């Protein structure tokens, strides 16, 4: 046993005191970061500190999800609350619109800060981004006219998931046609569905499962992710289609947040299903568009082919 001399005891005491001093002076982390509260999928409460905004973009994962990791080249379906640091003025709020946004992470469509914040995140994650306005928008970092270059933005993302732009349900064609109440549906891998052999326009709403999925059932209030094509009855070509835009889109499963026929036709369907919705003219009297901007031909019968890819 080594004897504890006064010299050794003094040195030990000095080391302990130094350790305590270092611990007490350790950097607790940046203080100029907003406080964010609230649960995933609900509009967050954001409180800004009374401090200048950080000069550089800063990203923080507030909650790590448990779903698949997002990848570059995918489209990311996410809710987002975006506001100005300086005034708290809201710039974008998908929670109020009741429709998530879709970000194409290919280095061209959104700002680099979005790529850095959303690539490599697990579905179900909540992410905070604080960024100078000139780096917070895309493409090319262009901010809207009402935002000054000296402003800073605060964004809270609730990441629903990442999806391949042409992702769709596995399954072939449906051999309906004029003899039935449904058009024939032909689907080739990675391509928009083609509807043909139209019969008489529907007088009643109907939903038909073309491919039965095996995933969880859709429940009211969930965010669902779909590929879809909408076609006016008897016409060629779609009036609205995710295949012709960015790819999979997210929607809140709530009656007034969806196109006529979607809520009753998709609630209870399983993820992995392909569903044909035939909607008569005037199915929801007075409908013009959703708060998220979804619209359909007024007083016209339509058909939708909807691939249910995910739900959260």
Task: Please provide the spans of the model-predicted regions.
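Cross-family detector of peptidyl-prolyl cis-trans isomerase
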Residues: 2-312
């Amino acid at each position: 046993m080594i004897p504890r001399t006064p010299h050794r005891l003094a040195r030990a005491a000095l080391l302990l005191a130094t350790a305590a001093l270092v611990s007490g002076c350790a950097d607790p982390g940046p203080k100029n970061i907003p406080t964010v509260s609230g649960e995933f999928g609900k509009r967050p409460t954001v409180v800004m500190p009374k401090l200048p905004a950080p000069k550089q973009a800063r990203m923080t994962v507030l909650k790590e999800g448990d779903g698949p990791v997002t990848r570059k080249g995918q489209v990311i379906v996410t809710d987002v609350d975006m506001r100005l640091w300086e005034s708290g003025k809201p710039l974008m709020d998908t929670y109020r619109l009741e429709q998530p946004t879709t970000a194409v992470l290919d280095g061209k469509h959104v700002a680099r800060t979005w790529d850095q914040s959303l690539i490599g995140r697990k579905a179900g994650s909540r992410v905070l981004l604080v960024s100078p306005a000139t780096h917070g928008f895309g493409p090319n970092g262009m901010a809207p006219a009402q935002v000054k270059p000296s402003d800073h933005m605060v964004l809270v993302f609730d990441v629903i998931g990442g999806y391949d732009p042409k992702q769709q349900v596995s399954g072939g064609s449906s051999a309906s046609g004029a003899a039935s109440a449904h058009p024939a549906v032909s689907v080739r891998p990675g391509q928009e569905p083609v509807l043909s052999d139209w019969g008489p326009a529907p007088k009643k709403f109907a939903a038909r499962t073309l491919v039965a999925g095996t995933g969880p059932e859709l429940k009211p209030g969930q965010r669902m992710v779909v590929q879809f094509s909408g076609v006016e009855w008897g016409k060629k070509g779609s009036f609205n289609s995710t295949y012709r835009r960015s790819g999979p889109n997210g929607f809140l499963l709530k009656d007034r947040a969806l196109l006529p026929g979607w809520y009753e036709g998709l609630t209870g369907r399983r993820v992995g299903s392909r569903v044909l919705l035939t909607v008569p003219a005037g199915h929801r009297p007075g409908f013009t568009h959703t708060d998220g901007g979804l619209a359909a031909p007024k007083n016209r019968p339509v058909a939708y082919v909807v691939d249910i890819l995910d739900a959260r």
